[in-house]
Amino acid sequence: TFVVRVRKVKDFAPNLISMKLEQKLGELILNKVKEAKVNLHTPEKTFFGVITQDKFVFGLKAAEILPKPFVERRPRRRPFFHPSAVQAKLARCMVNLAQPKEDDLVVDPFCGTASMLIEAGLIGCRVMGSDVRKQMIYGSLENLSHFGIEPEGMILADAKHLPIVSADCIVTDPPYGRSATTLGWSTRRIVEKFLSNACDVIPNRRRICMASPKSIRISSIGEEFGFRHLESHFVYVHRSLTREITVLEKI
């Protein structure tokens, strides 16, 4: 048994009705596989399609992540809260973009409240973090413990001078915006200094996923320091801030 589901991203293909496309695709599958039957409620297989700009992505759903656990890990639900904390779903997205393997060491040099480390730890990675503020180190330890994650270490250190010699990948969100502390440095200078050191820490063909204001143009900074820019995604926060989520690969 099977079902076909189609979703639109934003307002792309406004004249296309998702339900009609689901029906047409279902008919094609029924014509190809004679023993197949439609089951809208408890199907054995779910075919899933996404309509986006100039593309239709279609395939068989292999797994599903329920939204409730992400809600339960929202920053305000954690023991230690700070307004600059990254939401759990975005943190998991960034960890996934860095493509760590199980038991890899994932490092966040600007760990804040440990959003990235929590998500990496929950998928079986070893984690280590650092922050220039003692309050954040203690808060991160509290949050990690709350989710049953034991870090390899938490270091009070300035990420402009990385306190580690190696990591399998880095996932991080440097300070910027209204609630963050930059200790008098511009965000661009912080990113430049961090990336100049990070190129000596991760192996070739491994990744850094980091966020920054769109205006910083982090992809071009990464290329200056020996990284290949793989992809960028933009997240609107408010009128004066759009985040660029950038994936860089060491070459």
Description of each model-found segment:
Residues V9-L16, K20-Q23, E35, T42-I251:
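Class I S-adenosyl-L-methionine-dependent methyltransferase catalytic core
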Residues T1, L30-T42:
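Short secondary-structure capping/junction motifs at helix and strand boundaries
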Residues T1-V3, L105:
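Residues that mark the start of a beta-strand
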Residues R5-R7:
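Active-site nucleophile-His-acid catalytic modules used for acyl/amide transfer and hydrolysis
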